[in-house]
Amino acid sequence: MARSSLPNRRTAQFEANKRRTIAHAPSPSLSNGMHTLTPPTCNNGAATSDSNIHVYVRCRSRNKREIEEKSSVVISTLGPQGKEIILSNGSHQSYSSSKKTYQFDQVFGAESDQETVFNATAKNYIKEMLHGYNCTIFAYGQTGTGKTYTMSGDINILGDVQSTDNLLLGEHAGIIPRVLVDLFKELSSLNKEYSVKISFLELYNENLKDLLSDSEDDDPAVNDPKRQIRIFDNNNNNSSIMVKGMQEIFINSAHEGLNLLMQGSLKRKVAATKCNDLSSRSHTVFTITTNIVEQDSKDHGQNKNFVKIGKLNLVDLAGSENINRSGAENKRAQEAGLINKSLLTLGRVINALVDHSNHIPYRESKLTRLLQDSLGGMTKTCIIATISPAKISMEETASTLEYATRAKSIKNTPQVNQSLSKDTCLKDYIQEIEKLRNDLKNSRNKQGIFITQDQLDLYESNSILIDEQNLKIHNLREQIKKFKENYLNQLDINNLLQSEKEKLIAIIQNFNVDFSNFYSEIQKIHHTNLELMNEVIQQRDFSLENSQKQYNTNQNMQLKISQQVLQTLNTLQGSLNNYNSKCSEVIKGVTEELTRNVNTHKAKHDSTLKSLLNITTNLLMNQMNELVRSISTSLEIFQSDSTSHYRKDLNEIYQSHQQFLKNLQNDIKSCLDSIGSSILTSINEISQNCTTNLNSMNVLIENQQSGSSKLIKEQDLEIKKLKNDLINERRISNQFNQQLAEMKRYFQDHVSRTRSEFHDELNKCIDNLKDKQSKLDQDIWQKTASIFNETDIVVNKIHSDSIASLAHNAENTLKTVSQNNESFTNDLISLSRGMNMDISSKLRSLPINEFLNKISQTICETCGDDNTIASNPVLTSIKKFQNIICSDIALTNEKIMSLIDEIQSQIETISNENNINLIAINENFNSLCNFILTDYDENIMQISKTQDEVLSEHCEKLQSLKILGMDIFTAHSIEKPLHEHTRPEASVIKALPLLDYPKQFQIYRDAENKSKDDTSNSRTCIPNLSTNENFPLSQFSPKTPVPVPDQPLPKVLIPKSINSAKSNRSKTLPNTEGTGRESQNNLKRRFTTEPILKGEETENNDILQNKKLHQ
């Protein structure tokens, strides 16, 4: 493979020195194109679509210091192909709050080696550079996280140095050495002519230094301002910069580039800190530029070759550090401050680009100026963010990840560099050599002096400023000449005006007499106006008194209706309370009666048992006495014969009788105990049944009470709504009164202003006023009639709908109350029936009868004979006891039924009263609705008297001035301004009465706010009269006050008021919502900016009648 280098073929100087010092643009991040030549037509650098900056993150393992400090790991990656990195804050919070995940293009963990990072990040940019793109790769991160290791690494060379294919690098070689090796491998495979040049810049303490220059730091030529490296804007390309004073060295192999890289790296500023033993104290930019010669495919046998230029910038940024942690002092602290300042500026640039800010602070640091095109420019950019996994560096790690995340959103627009032909390149080089020779010759012959670019720019700007000043001086001289000419012309004009002024003074003096006559006529008109105003005020007060009376009557009726509703509700509440108290009393009486009956039965039972015991004991004692007597007699008779035999028999008989008595006594006691226990159990069951029934009754009563309370609350809410409506109506009327007062004040101001302007525009008004009056009156009244009908129809519909809804709600409440009453009565009837059946059946099923039957059977078995059974007192007492129990059961049953009947009758009476009350409430609501509807229908056309007559007659008086044919300007002297003479000083005019608010004017604004939203859609939009060219209303005066702030006020005549026809007025004034709306429409008819369209008629007879009166 034959390959050659362009500098070797062009000049022998390139082969001998291998370097050349020129002024150029070293990279696309430093400038967008090195040369200022016009490109050929073969490739104009078409731009590709926008692409985001690629962001990679590399996390190293813990170093020796972090292991010794026992700092935990807070960074976790997802393997060598992962794209997420997880930062945990190490606190004992919840899992979700203690960890945060970041996403990037790829994340390299501690297991990733240098080759993996190079293949994923920089290898593709070599091909992009060979295709003519400008590319940038820079490392960003905290100090000591491996930026220099990633970019440079180990630069030692292994293998055959002379062979490109057999050149090997160590495993710790960084991106820059690997780029150089792979670049020459790619170039050797192209079989094309090429050249490669490199540059190596260092930014230390905001000063640029060329690391490839032969001078040392202690060389005085380095500090010479003439030889310092400077940054300039590229005039040929607005988005790039140029670096002057930097060397570019052509290389023929990767070995030469690696040697230059090693020499420059040795000159770089490094220092030992607590964070890193070899901390880089400066930013470096290593630039590789390739020029590839290609043949144009469009040329047919002409053999025109073009040079394709590509650049790759490899940036190694200095690490940000905390001064307290790094232990930097004095000079090192100053270095750290400048490093952090430049990195902070870089972060601000990234934030501004992400936020799409109008201002990007590139010029605040030289670092951002160097990287201007790489951030948001026309290059393909890659950022490698290096971080530490230790917890002690967690804040710096989080800051680096945040910056990298924001930088991922920056968009660049990559663009292919323009291809240059060989001829143009040679021409540029020849021109550059000639320019340098001339500069060298001039400096040797001392025909010129060496100046810096800043001084040259200042000289050029001063020369431009001098030229501008000379032009200004010339323009000022021309203006002075014109001013002199204008001054002479103005003197002539002033002389003419003075003569005219004298003539006008004479004319004005002649017209003073006419003005005095005119003033007397104005006073007469004013007197008539005063009289009319007094009449208007009297009629207004009278109408307002009537309206106030009507309003008071309506309010009283509403109060009476509300009081009646409250009374009915209170009576209903009282009846319910009485019903509840009676029910509780009945229940208490039933329980007391039952307990009393049980006690009486128990006492009777005890007395009968005692009587039975007494009878049995007496019988037994009598029998014993008889037996004793018989035995004694027998003993006396047979004592002598058989004393011992009878004594034994007697003892046996005595013992047998005694045992019989004991058994009998025990049986009686057991029977009595069983009877008592059965009676107690039956009584307990009866009491439990009674309590359950009473509880169910209480539940029903409580449900009824809750239903009635809900009804009462609903009625209270309706009453409150009515009260709130009344309050709102009063508030609206107050607002309308305020608006009317403002209108009056505006009218007064308007009258005063028209009087002051009266002498200026009276003649113009008189000429046009008489011709337009009739047409304007007709138009206004036709339009007001149509609008009035439309709004009245809408308001009628609204009120009718609202009243119908109220009536429907009232009917629903009545239905619910009646249904509740019927359900309550049915429940009580079923409950009473159940109670009757339960009580009677349970009283009849008492076990006392069974016990008594058992006792009677045992007695009958013991006695044996029928006679003894019939004469036995125990059986008779048992039968009597059974009869008493049956009679008591019947009496209690009758009492309970009577109580149930009474309760049912009371419930029926209460339900009837509730029905009556609900019917009364419904009637009251119906009457209220009918009253409102009828009152609205009757008084819908009622209109209160206003100031229309006064204004119309006042305008008619103004028309009479035209008949006089006098000019009012004759009454004034030209020596004084006109505004000092416009208002006549007459005490009569100042004594005009104030147009105060009428009393209770709120009724005119009642329905305004309510119907605004409903009627806004139905209104028609009328064009403004002032836009008519044939009808210049803006010249009219006086102006009619209009309560519409966003439209110009047309100057119209006020038509005659309908109050002139007093016989047509109704004696009752409007007081409902409809009349309030009518008053609003009436005001609109008087004060409006909307003309009336001709041809529109209404069916309302009252409006037609009023229209006829006005016409």
Curated annotation (Swiss-Prot):
- Biological processes, Gene Ontology terms: 2-micrometer plasmid partitioning; cell division; initial mitotic spindle pole body separation; microtubule depolymerization; microtubule-based movement; mitotic sister chromatid segregation; mitotic spindle assembly; mitotic spindle elongation
List all Polar residues biased stretches: 1-11, 1017-1038, 1057-1082
Paired cysteines (S-S): none
Q: Which GO terms describe its cellular component?
A: cytoplasm; kinesin complex; mitotic spindle; nucleus; spindle microtubule
Q: Domain Kinesin motor, which positions?
A: 52-410
- Return the Basic and acidic residues bias intervals: 1007-1016
Q: Does the keyword Hydrolase apply?
A: no
From the UniProt entry, list the residue stretches annotated as the region Disordered. 1-34, 1007-1111
Query: Where found?
Result: Cytoplasm, Cytoskeleton, Spindle
Keyword annotations from UniProtKB, A to Z: ATP-binding, Cell cycle, Cell division, Coiled coil, Cytoplasm, Cytoskeleton, Microtubule, Mitosis, Motor protein, Nucleotide-binding
Q: Give the residues annotated as coiled coil.
A: 424-510, 648-670, 710-780, 808-828
**Pfam families xrefs:** Kinesin
Q: Name one GO molecular function term.
A: plus-end-directed microtubule motor activity
Quote the record's binding site residues for ATP. 141-148
InterPro entries reported for this sequence: KIF11-like, KIF11-like_kin_motor_dom, Kinesin_motor_CS, Kinesin_motor_dom, Kinesin_motor_dom_sf, P-loop_NTPase
**Role summary:** Required for assembly of the mitotic spindle. Interacts with spindle microtubules to produce an outwardly directed force acting upon the poles. Following spindle assembly, CIN8 and KIP1 apparently act to oppose a force that draws separated poles back together. This force seems to be mediate by KAR3.
* Protein family (similarity comment): Belongs to the TRAFAC class myosin-kinesin ATPase superfamily. Kinesin family. BimC subfamily.
Any further remarks? Present with 56 molecules/cell in log phase SD medium.
Subunit description:
Might be dimeric.
What's this protein's name?
A: Kinesin-like protein KIP1
Q: Which organism is it from?
A: Saccharomyces cerevisiae (strain ATCC 204508 / S288c) (Baker's yeast)
